[in-house]
Amino acid sequence: MIARCIMVLGTSSGAGKSWLATALCRWFSDQGLRVAPFKAQNMSNNARVVAAPGGGQGEIGSAQYFQALAARTEPEVRMNPVLLKPEADTRSQVVLMGQVSEELTRMPWRGRSVHVWPHVAAALDALRAENDVVVIEGAGSPAEINLHANDIVNMRVARHAGAHGLLVTDIDRGGAFAHLYGTWALLPEDERALIQGFVLNKFRGDAALLAPAPDMLRERTGVPTVATIPMQWRHGLPEEDGVFDDAGHVRAGAGGAVHTTVAVVAYPRISNLDEFQPLKGVPGLRLVWARSPAEVAGADWIVLPGSKATAADLAWLRAQGLDAAIAAHAARGGRVLGICGGLQMLGEALIDTHGVDGNAPGLGLLPLVTAFDPAKTVRRTRTAFGALRGAWSALSGVAVQGYEIRHGRTAQHPAMAAAGDVAHPAIPGLAWQNARGNVLGLYLHGLFEDAVALRALFGADVPTLDAVFDRLARGVDEWFDPAWRAARRAGR
């Protein structure tokens, strides 16, 4: 039996496609169905390491990773066959079926579709053969008429799958009915027929006030409005496009007080931004995306996250004066955490003899040196911290699981080691700590997504992903028209 396909399309980026697809994955799974997510092509530096054919591992966009978890299935590379990871304003690294393709990366984007479409179609066909339902997510808008000829992610996928299309719009921005009608009208007739329902997202107020607009829209298009979704201020999932949402967000602690401020340096090519989502659920924690010294002032922690362009982001950091602010914070004994590219920045030097990322002096907070390597490390990792000292001692002995996505090898700085200045190996080959104990760098992404580590660091439990998925699935029953839900349950 070939799976039926539901496709979530949007009138724009940020309309709500990703989290609605996630909600539908859990809702269909709750019906006892085998469900898989799919997005033909994703553009994001938020990526996860998942299973690849032949027992290997590869990368997919984080949104499809979370959708797979919501669907109660193992995430794997077929769920996102093409991933574009921006490295500069006009250049992206191309990941095909989980692996970097240098050939496609060098190719002009308009010429790629003919090469990648067979992989997209094969991945989708395989998922359809193994599941009852495939929930497909589109990208941007399907009515970008300048891109339509090279489309591999929206209506070409919908046609290939014969998908039941839902077109979502953000009504909070204004002009929602014009966006829905305009998007529908710009599609060729055969593609219009695939749009089976309109969805109004981020609505505030009394839904009765929308009348008679949904009926008028149906008269013009033949498409019913099947759901009105209230504004979800904090739905509990990371933003798919890496938006710096909830700046200064605080979840009230005892008495509504702020106990800890964590400032994450938001450099231009930040990667894996989504791994900080759990911090928004820690009571009394204030999370700040910092782009200036003023925004790290008074922070208890400063975090240097991953980067897709480490040397360039380090240069940006210096240009903002953040290097001095971070050094002063560390000198006062404040906690500093570097993750992946952030770890590399904390060392003495970045050495690039292969033209991967560029040479640069580091921040000098750890006596380490990083040599960039064209070979990319992509793997899931389960390990445990050794004995840590000082501010990070709560992590001593804590077993963690996460993932590595990086270019580069980091080691003790030879000259400094000879002089007795050695970084303490918190996890051999993966994490190092300074002698004072307040600066920690690690290659492992996902520290804050590990419940045991989060409890050790903050003494708090946060809602599990399953609880978030279940709440979203209950929302489908609340927001969607009963007839639409009944038809989906009946297999139509």
From Swiss-Prot:
InterPro entries: Class_I_gatase-like (IPR029062), CobQ/CobB/MinD/ParA_Nub-bd_dom (IPR002586), CobQ_GATase1 (IPR033949), CobQ_N (IPR047045), CobQ_synth (IPR004459), GATase_3 (IPR011698), P-loop_NTPase (IPR027417)
Alphabetically ordered keywords of this record: Cobalamin biosynthesis, Glutamine amidotransferase
Residue span(s) of domain GATase cobBQ-type: 259-453
Pathway assigned to this chain's UniProt record: Cofactor biosynthesis; adenosylcobalamin biosynthesis
Active site, UniProt feature: C340, H445
Database matches in Pfam families: CbiA, GATase_3
GO molecular function: ABC-type vitamin B12 transporter activity; catalytic activity
Gene3D superfamilies cross-referenced by the UniProt entry: 3.40.50.880, P-loop containing nucleotide triphosphate hydrolases
GO BP term (any one): cobalamin biosynthetic process
PANTHER family, per database record: COBYRIC ACID SYNTHASE, DETHIOBIOTIN SYNTHETASE
Biological role: Catalyzes amidations at positions B, D, E, and G on adenosylcobyrinic A,C-diamide. NH(2) groups are provided by glutamine, and one molecule of ATP is hydrogenolyzed for each amidation.
Family (UniProt): Belongs to the CobB/CobQ family. CobQ subfamily.
Record protein name field: Cobyric acid synthase
Organism ancestry: Bacteria, Pseudomonadati, Pseudomonadota, Betaproteobacteria, Burkholderiales
